[in-house]
Amino acid sequence: MSDQDKEAFPPQHQDHQPGREAAMNPRPESSARSYTPCGKLEGRVALITGGDSGIGKAVAIAFAKEGADIAITYFDEHEDAEETRKLVEQTGRRCIVMAGDIGDAKFCRQIVHSTVSDLGRLDVLVNNAGEQHPQQRIEDISEEQLERTFRTNIFAMFHTVTAALPHLKEGARIINTTSVTAYRGSSHLIDYAATKGAIVAFTRSLSQQLAARKIHVNAVAPGPVWTPLIPASFSAEQVAHFGADVPLERAGQPDEIAPCYVFLACGDSSYMSG
């Protein structure tokens, strides 16, 4: 058996987007048990969209370990969100969870209001929620899918940032999750890749506009990461070999990505924006 034929994960598929972490085998690694915090975000408040599972969950836990109170949003994965809330609270930090459609501008405004109302302030905004729907041909991407993908992946960032800005003071951070597909492209994720490219341009442009206000804007572009979106997007056979085609020959785990967000959220990245 060649390396390309070896299974990276047990074959599995979920019919519901954005997927449920509780149904995955194996569960993604999010808790970063070996991570040693040093109070880099002490007293801060972070709002993380899509924070119930995957990268967002790992970021929420890492931020909490560094001293931040956390607000997370999710779609309808109540079990995952409750688990994340408990893990954050185990660090001694506060956590609120908010269910809704991030593609709805009204919800974007509401989550900012609730974060400030319940946690007292907002220092770090992580725009992380996203969705993807593979299609083999561009002709198979419906108008509904196209609009939905853009609403969730990029329009939501505009709406959430606009709502957050009145509360973000000098030194605040905005961190957007893009993807390696923004640079490499993807033949079966054309609409998704287009939104991720838009996020790169959005991040660079917004960083220039907010520089005078001393608000830092950056993005993280992960490669293949083992999150619920994977079994919810691809066939069982595709999932079995997910991540095997990259140089490290495996997918990343969420808690291997989270330290990038910690770096961008704290003073260590004081000379980085855009």
What feature does the model see in each segment?
Residues 1-30, 212, 219, 241-272:
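C-terminal helical subdomain
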Residues 179:
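Residue(s) in the substrate-gating loop at a strand-loop-helix junction
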Residues 78, 99-113, 143, 255-256:
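The beta1-alpha1 cofactor-binding region of Rossmann-like NAD(H)/NADP(H)-dependent oxidoreductases
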Residues 104, 109, 132-147, 166, ...:
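Conserved mid-core segment of classical short-chain dehydrogenase/reductases
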Residues 188, 212, 223-246:
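A glycine/serine/threonine-rich, flexible loop-to-helix segment
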Residues 139-158, 175, 199, 248:
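Catalytic Tyr-X3-Lys loop
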Residues 61, 113, 117, 152-172, ...:
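Amphipathic alpha-helical dimer-interface segment in Rossmann-like NAD(P)H-dependent oxidoreductases
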Residues 161, 195, 203:
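Active-site helix of classical SDR
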